[in-house]
Amino acid sequence: MSPRELVVLGTAGQAPTRTRNHNGYLLRWDGTSVLFDPGEGTQRQMLHAEVSAPRIERICVTHRHNDHCLGVPGVLNRMAQDGPGRPVTLHGPDDAFEHLRALAVVAAAHVEVTVEGIPVRDEPVEVARVAGARLSARALDHRVPTVGYRLEEPAGRSFDAAALADAGITGPDVGELQRRGELRGVRLADVSVERPGQVFGFVMDTRDHPAVVDLVRDADLAVLECTYSERHADLARDRGHLTARQAGRAAARAGVRTLVLAHFSQRYPDLEELAAEARAAVAELGGRTRVHLAHDLDVVPVPPRRSAPARAAS
């Protein structure tokens, strides 16, 4: 099975540093790839990370600020050079539609590109299906219209082999039972339990807002910006960003399994300060979220599936 993992291409905020490129986050998911917020220099980072450009199916932009989208032309050119690739869809808020279309035109790449605007609403808006999973977007609170993204796999079923055998359900009958819900007096619930689908959440520039928790609720893996430390909370609020403490608290409240901290201000020479702040916030709420401080070119696996609950005895 193809891996599900996040490739971190860049982690800087508004200004890159000697060791941190502008934004760029590539999610590998069941043989396809979704690229989030490619800032300037993403194409070069893809080479370092050995990312296959033709596998990119969608580019999802949270808002029109340059550090989140100026890498689009280079990525499209890389896809054309490394092809043959699949058609690519470029998603972003309605407010950014013309901006994104211009970036696609500037690329002048021989890649089939569709630009789709997303209504910015205070409720989930379905964007697309990715390998059977639902990709949705929801409004956040930044200085320009901004969305966060959520990729949610449908729940599946875990079958009890012994219960199937006892019920005489074998071979193609298992699939028939799953489709119909009942077969020869045997109910699906008698021989299986629901298995939660995996969830990925992506939240960039935003003030602390209830939508942050909703976007990453029960996420196996979530990327949250933490541009500032809590000691610069006033600056974070004024500029429309999260602090590390706010990111940690949101992840803990949402039940996130692994939190990837990213989008750091260049004012912090030692980013362990931000990681420690987020971990302390998780601990304060009694959360179990693992906090990962992102570095450029990190590869962070989506945690293994949650175990299905035990089937009740009949």
From Swiss-Prot:
Binding site for Zn(2+) 2: D67, H68, D205, H263
Record bears the keyword Manganese: no
Documented EC number(s): 3.1.26.11
Active site residues per record: D67
UniProt-recorded Gene Ontology molecular function terms: 3'-tRNA processing endoribonuclease activity; zinc ion binding
Superkingdom of the organism of origin: Bacteria
Reactions catalysed according to its record: Endonucleolytic cleavage of RNA, removing extra 3' nucleotides from tRNA precursor, generating 3' termini of tRNAs. A 3'-hydroxy group is left at the tRNA terminus and a 5'-phosphoryl group is left at the trailer molecule
Cofactor, free-text remark: Binds 2 Zn(2+) ions.
Cofactor annotation: Zn(2+)
Residues where Zn(2+) 1 binds: H63, H65, H142, D205
Keyword annotations: Endonuclease, Hydrolase, Metal-binding, Nuclease, tRNA processing, Zinc
One Pfam family of this chain: Lactamase_B_2
Functional note: Zinc phosphodiesterase, which displays some tRNA 3'-processing endonuclease activity. Probably involved in tRNA maturation, by removing a 3'-trailer from precursor tRNA.
Subunit structure, interactors included: Homodimer.
Family: Belongs to the RNase Z family.
HAMAP family referenced in this protein's UniProt entry, alphabetically: RNase_Z_BN
Stated name of the protein: Ribonuclease Z
